[in-house]
């Protein structure tokens, strides 16, 4: 889709286009087979995830996520991984493994068979569709064919009225920012928008669209009334 910077899209990106009907959104998620939760802020989301959704979980895979860092869940997971008692939750994260001098590929593989997987989503629509772009595929793979319990933490800035506006934001805001925080070598990082590049530095190699919860998996969608990630 060609880049479109009209006024309506700018408003949507700034989150100024509407008041969110969270009750309706949670009901839509429930109808589609998801477990939906509304949290007023990051502190409430962190408490819900760490004290309730991860109860009984002993291992967890984690996808790269600015949202998890910003709401404090990343630090809480590191603390759990560092424990030495029976309550420890072993964390499989490439960031953690790299910092420890371990092979990050092992974290990717173990994350696919962990008790749970946690990340954010690149975008979701008010109709309950989740859209994700990946360069390697570990995150989208784990979300649809990995652990039986999947937890997505979603800030209000990632919720869009429809697929078209979500896709426009992904290609022209999310991907360039992700690349800038990574290698910065992609064409979109340099241009600040999608230029539909076709080379080895392209970061949006894989796109997944999840229209409904898979019947053999638990999806826990934590909606936070704050802007998290991009």
Residue ranges and their predicted role:
Residues 3-19:
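Short, Lys/Arg-enriched N-terminal segments with co-localized hydrophobic residues
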Residues 18-22, 139:
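N-proximal short alpha-helices
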Residues 12-17, 42-43, 132-135:
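Short, functional N-terminal and low-complexity linear motifs
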Residues 21-108, 113-118:
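N-terminal active-site beta-alpha-beta segment that forms phosphate/nucleotide-binding
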Residues 2-8, 121, 130:
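Exposed boundary/loop context
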Residues 111-230:
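Conserved phosphate- and dinucleotide-binding cores of soluble alpha/beta proteins
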Residues 9-10, 31-34, 88-92, 103-105, ...:
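N-terminal start-of-chain detector that recognizes signal peptides
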